[in-house]
Structure formats: C-alpha cells, structure tokens
Curated annotation (Swiss-Prot):
Gene label: carS
Protein name per UniProt: CDP-archaeol synthase
Record EC number: 2.7.7.67
Keywords: Cell membrane, Lipid biosynthesis, Lipid metabolism, Magnesium, Membrane, Phospholipid biosynthesis, Phospholipid metabolism, Transferase, Transmembrane, Transmembrane helix
GO molecular function: CDP-2,3-bis-(O-geranylgeranyl)-sn-glycerol synthase activity
Pathway info: Membrane lipid metabolism; glycerophospholipid metabolism
C-alpha cells in the first residue's frame, strides 16, 4: 500500500500541471492556428502558451514542495515531468484533431491518460523506480479523478463541457 501511495506522490506534479491549464481561458495557441494538409488545426485553441506556462509553474512549484518532504531533488523532475505531462496532453489533442474530433469532444481514455503517458515517459527516463502496480493504480485513480474534477470544473464554469 505504501508503494502505491509513493507512486501517486511521484505523479503529483503532472496532476497539478494538467489540472491548472484550464484556468487560462484564452491566449496564444501553441500551433499559431496552423492547419495540416488534412485542413484541421494541429492542436486547436485549447493549447496555449499561457496555459503551458501556468502548468509548468504550478507543477514545478509542487515538485519543489515534494523535494522538501522526500529529501530528493524534485524541482527539476517536477518541471520536466510537468512538461512531459503537457506534451502528452498535446499529443492527445493532436490525435483528436487527426481523427476529426473538435475541442471539447469526448475521447474516453485518451482524455484521461494522455498526460499520464507523457509524465510516465519522463519519470522512467529519470530512473524513478516505478512498477506496473503503481502506474496502473495512478491510471485508475486518474480516470476517477478526471470524471469528478471535470464535472466540478464544468459546474464552476471553468470548462464548457463536463468531460
């Protein structure tokens, strides 16, 4: 059980980074509104430089706080993990655009786990000792948290859709 909770702690910067981006309502799109040959936007209006900066700031800050408690250097990992999470989220948006889904359209599993994939790649590349049970635990927890937090964000008018 302690191992599962430690696995969750490892993912906190990514969770915070992913959860903070929706607070930015508008900004400069990362894709600069460019379209690919299929006529669709690369990422869409939902991925902005301002949202990315806020996500990196919050995720890095949480990494710094974690480093105080774990006694290890998590500031850098917090930053890079947050970046990995946001790149995973952008990959999810890219895939959604390629299959014809617009911003806000449902894409079960992809919507919930794209950022976890990016964070996991970073954590593994930094030799963080994750096991399959920790990753599965975090994925299941993230799916449940995603449904709950998105509904709350929708009710608070932070998001335009409840998913």
């Amino acid at each position: 059980m302690i191992g599962l909770l430690l696995g969750l702690i490892y993912y906190i910067p990514a969770l915070v980074a992913n959860g903070s981006a929706p607070f930015i309502k508008s900004g400069t799109p990362i894709d600069f509104k460019r379209k690919l040959n299929d006529g669709r936007r690369v990422l869409g209006d939902g991925k902005t430089f301002e949202g990315l900066l806020l996500s990196l700031t919050f995720g890095t800050t949480v990494g710094a706080i974690i480093s105080r408690f774990l006694g290890i250097e998590w500031i850098i990992i917090g930053f890079v993990e947050s970046l990995g999470a946001m790149l995973g989220d952008m990959l999810g948006a890219f895939i959604k655009r390629r299959i014809g889904l617009e911003r806000g359209a449902r894409a079960p599993i992809l919507d919930q786990l794209d950022f976890i994939l990016g964070a996991t790649v970073v954590l593994i590349s930094f030799n963080v000792n994750l096991n399959i049970y920790q990753v599965v635990f975090v994925c299941v927890l993230v799916i449940a948290l995603h449904m709950f937090t998105n509904y709350v964000a929708y009710r608070l008018k932070i998001k335009s859709v409840p998913w």
